[in-house]
Regions:
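Structural motif
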Residues: 48-50, 164, 323
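Pocket-forming structural segment of enzyme catalytic cores
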Residues: 38, 62-78, 83-175
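Glycine/serine-rich phosphate-binding loop and adjoining beta1-alpha1 elements at the start
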Residues: 170-198
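Glycine-rich phosphate/diphosphate-binding loops that line cofactor/substrate pockets in enzymes
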Residues: 1, 40-43, 207-214
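ATP/NTP-dependent adenylation/nucleotidyl-transfer catalytic domains that generate, transfer
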Residues: 188-192, 196-625
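Flexible gly/pro-rich beta->alpha loop and the following alpha-helix that scaffold active-site loops
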Residues: 4-7, 12-78, 83-89, 182-193
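Glycine/threonine-rich flexible loop motifs
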Residues: 53-63, 175, 332-338
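Short amphipathic alpha-helix with an adjacent loop that forms part of the alpha/beta core around
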Residues: 36-43, 118, 308-314
Length: 625
């Protein structure tokens, strides 16, 4: 039996990322429930307790088999797992005086030697996402490292083989994270026993096992995940047993369906069809404003269209399975693990899909993988970079980038929170910028809520907006220093209950004043989608021509119903850098590129304002819905 590291999933958005990191380092790892029987730990060399959305003092917390702490196996607790370890040995945990979301500076105690930090410098950047904190250590534990607001950021009890960390070393934004995991595996006396060739073979064998003698119908959005799933299915089963279905749902980018078809044919994929169902999908989201309801309507419509295609092609349902290019983050953010909290419902995790899963009628070959792993698999299959490295484009397409609103004024509850958000923002001191920038800076709140994720919980709050000095013709000063913007953004979201995102205003129609802007009635209609397509295409064309497209993970253009009139809109540029989707940093372009993009967007007569999103994940998700 293969030696393993077991990750106990307390519901963290990053639980499977821990297992993935160990696998990438060459160590086989598995996910298990915290309530697991001790038999699960047979041949286990080490145990990691993940983070989670609960407070240890909530009435409803994940069930935990405390006997696990009696095992003579090394344990590493992360965030919520940090608290479980400390409480298990008599420590005290309560609400932290200051929550930490995003970057923090870890300082190691020079008087304490730790095998976990062997070969790691005494000052490190780490990634935090917590609201609770350890106030006194468990028996036998010593403090290994601290941050400005967290005195027990890293602890150990070597005699018990126990370690606990407040920060998330599983995310790339903790650069020393892989080294910490490598050191933990070394402490566990774990030998390397896993590689990407093994992963590919496991997936192909799994497809053959799950499909049995049936054929497979796959939703093809044209994005990386569905494309590589298509290649995997063709490789495992042969093109004669696989049919790709690309649905033009009316939410595609400019010329997207045409470009997807040409790309597939170029690389030898002939077993796919295109179904134009744009009117059906537009009807499904008509009048909807709630982002969750919109996503669910889109997911259910995919199933409905699939059923009509099956009927039209006379496919015997007893002979066919449905396949999806679902990633593990889709499952996590939809609350699809036992202890996780729903951040947003993905279209491939709505009830209709869940029903098919329960009946064993769906194959999801890459559901245990993250985006960077999927791209590695695609390259191993011989796919071209134009397919493997293109920006993600999920099934719902641009529909989730069109924010919707049914009223021209905020509700009483929203108005109250909006005013509280503005009051909070006014009280936050931003001293990151030079005197010239600080003198002209204006702080405001945009009255359009967006989705975020903080401490493993979904948030739905307002964005803060920073405006620098005007430079004529409606354009505003663009700060050069990305780090100062990031620091200001973190200061705002870490200090606020009502703000989860920060943007800077780059352009405002010079004929308009601030008081001309109001929340407008706006829905996901063809007219708004066409406007968004034009703006989005300008950005993407400029990213390609400047070679910036390949330097970032994804760019989203967001359409806000915040303008001077109903047929106009404001737009947000949202470029991000990420490896695994679970965390991200906003990308920052050269000033010349931003100015070129802005000048082209400003020439469109329906554009009232343009903003740039300077928020990392957490506290914000990639998209606003």
């Amino acid at each position: 039996m293969r030696s393993k590291i077991v990750v106990l999933d307390f519901g963290s958005q990053y639980a499977h990322l821990i297992a993935k990191r160990f696998r990438m380092l060459g160590y086989y790892s598995e996910i298990a429930l915290p309530s697991s029987d001790l038999s699960v730990f047979e041949n286990c060399r080490g145990i990691v307790f993940s983070g989670g959305p609960s407070s240890v003092y909530d009435e409803k917390v994940p069930e935990f088999n405390s006997q696990i702490l009696n095992l003579d196996i090394p344990v590493l607790g992360l965030c919520y797992g940090h608290y479980i370890v400390q409480l298990g040995y008599g420590g005290k945990v309560s609400k932290a005086d200051v929550g930490e979301f995003g970057f923090a500076e870890l300082k190691l105690n020079p008087d304490v030697k730790s095998p976990l930090f062997e070969g790691i410098d005494c000052v490190q950047q780490v990634w935090m996402s917590h609201q609770d904190g350890v106030f006194s250590l468990g028996e036998g534990f010593e403090a290994v490292g601290s941050t400005k607001d967290c005195p027990f950021a890293a602890t150990q009890n070597l005699s018990k083989k126990r370690f606990s960390l407040q920060f998330h070393c599983e995310v790339k934004d903790t650069p020393c994270g892989d080294k910490i995991f490598e050191n933990f595996a070394k402490f566990c006396k774990m030998e390397k026993n896993w590689d990407q060739d093994t992963v590919l073979q496991v997936i192909l064998d799994g497809i053959k096992k799950d499909a049995k003698d049936k054929k497979v119908l796959l939703f093809l959005s044209g994005g990386v995940d569905s494309t590589i799933t298509f290649a995997l299915l063709n490789n495992a089963l042969g093109q004669e047993r696989v049919l790709g279905l690309h649905i033009d749902n009316g939410f595609m980018r400019k010329n997207e369906s045409k470009n997807v078809s040409e790309a597939y044919k170029k690389f030898g994929f002939n077993n796919f069809i295109v179904e134009d169902a744009s009117n059906v999908f537009l009807d499904a989201v008509k009048g909807l404003t709630d982002p969750q309801k919109k996503r669910m309507a889109i997911g259910e419509t995919f199933i409905s269209v699939r059923n009509k295609v099956v009927e039209k092609l006379n496919l015997n349902e007893d002979d066919w399975l449905l396949a999806q290019g679902t990633l593990y983050p889709d499952i996590i953010e939809s609350g699809g693990t036992k202890n996780s909290n729903t951040i947003k419902t993905h279209h491939n995790r709505v009830q209709g899909i869940q029903n098919l899963i329960e009946k064993g009628l769906i194959i999801e070959p890459i559901k245990e993988l993250y985006k960077d792993e999927v791209r590695t698999i695609g390259k191993k299959l011989g796919l071209d970079d134009s397919l493997v490295m293109r920006h993600p484009f999920p099934g719902p397409g641009l529909s989730i980038n069109v924010l919707c609103n049914s009223e021209k004024a905020l509700s009483e509850k929203d108005e109250k929170e909006f005013l509280s958000a503005q009051k909070e923002l006014d009280s936050i001191v931003l001293d990151q910028f030079c005197e010239n920038c600080s003198k002209f800076i204006k702080k405001s709140v945009i009255p359009c809520r967006s989705v975020g994720v903080q401490g493993d919980f979904r948030t739905y709050r307002f964005p803060a907006c920073l405006t620098f000095r005007p430079e004529g013709k409606g354009f505003f000063h663009i700060p050069k220093n990305r780090e100062k913007l990031e620091s200001a953004s973190s200061s705002i979201t870490n200090s606020s209950k009502f703000l989860n995102r920060t943007v800077i205003k780059l352009y405002q129609n010079p004929l308009l004043k601030d008081e001309d802007f109001h929340l407008q009635r706006g829905f996901c209609t063809k007219d708004r989608l066409d406007q968004l397509r034009e703006v989005d295409n300008i950005v993407l064309q400029n990213l390609h021509s400047s070679s910036w497209y390949d330097k970032i993970f994804q760019h989203l253009t967001i359409d806000l119903p915040y303008a001077a009139s109903e047929n106009h809109a404001s737009f947000v540029l949202r470029p991000v850098c990420s490896e695994d989707v679970m965390t991200a940093r906003f990308a920052w372009f050269p000033k010349e590129l931003i100015e070129k993009i802005l000048s082209e967007i400003a020439s469109l007569d329906f554009v009232d304002a343009v903003y740039f999103d300077i928020t990392n994940k957490p506290p914000a998700t990639f998209g606003w819905e």
